[in-house]
């Protein structure tokens, strides 16, 4: 059983908000709008970060099957065998790489790795880095 991430350590960035929502929907079966409201309580992100977070979260949930296929292929293992936090960070990162052309690939990879490091541990960050670089190339 993996330990639940402490999302209070998350920044107010749209990427961290999106990761929290994707994680909550995946692990708790929460509806996206309910998870979004819960994630925003007590936070006041910049309007641009709020919009980015909403696009990343809802887009990652909407494209989950496509993202999971890409992640599993690049990771060389089943999506279920990937740590839940790493899986959520990867979904948000891969969504940026595949569906958000205005975000440079290096920024998507770098921000996902930082998010994984902040919310998880160095091993998750290294794994996220390897998988995203493989997909980005």
Features from the language model and the residues they span:
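Class I Rossmann-like S-adenosyl-L-methionine
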Residues: 1-137
């Amino acid at each position: 059983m993996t330990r639940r991430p402490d999302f209070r350590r998350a920044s107010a960035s749209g990427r961290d908000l999106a990761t929290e929502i994707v994680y909550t929907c995946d692990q708790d079966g929460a509806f996206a709008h309910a998870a979004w409201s819960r994630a925003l309580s007590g936070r006041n992100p910049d309007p641009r970060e709020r919009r980015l977070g909403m696009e990343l979260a809802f887009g990652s949930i909407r494209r989950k099957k496509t993202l999971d296929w890409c992640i599993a292929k690049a990771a060389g293992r089943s999506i279920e065998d990937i740590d839940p936090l790493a899986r959520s960070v990867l979904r948000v990162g891969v969504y940026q790489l595949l569906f958000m052309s205005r975000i440079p690939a290096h920024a998507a990879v770098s921000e996902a790795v930082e998010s994984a490091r902040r919310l998880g541990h160095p091993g998750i960050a290294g794994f996220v880095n390897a998988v995203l670089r493989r997909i980005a190339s």
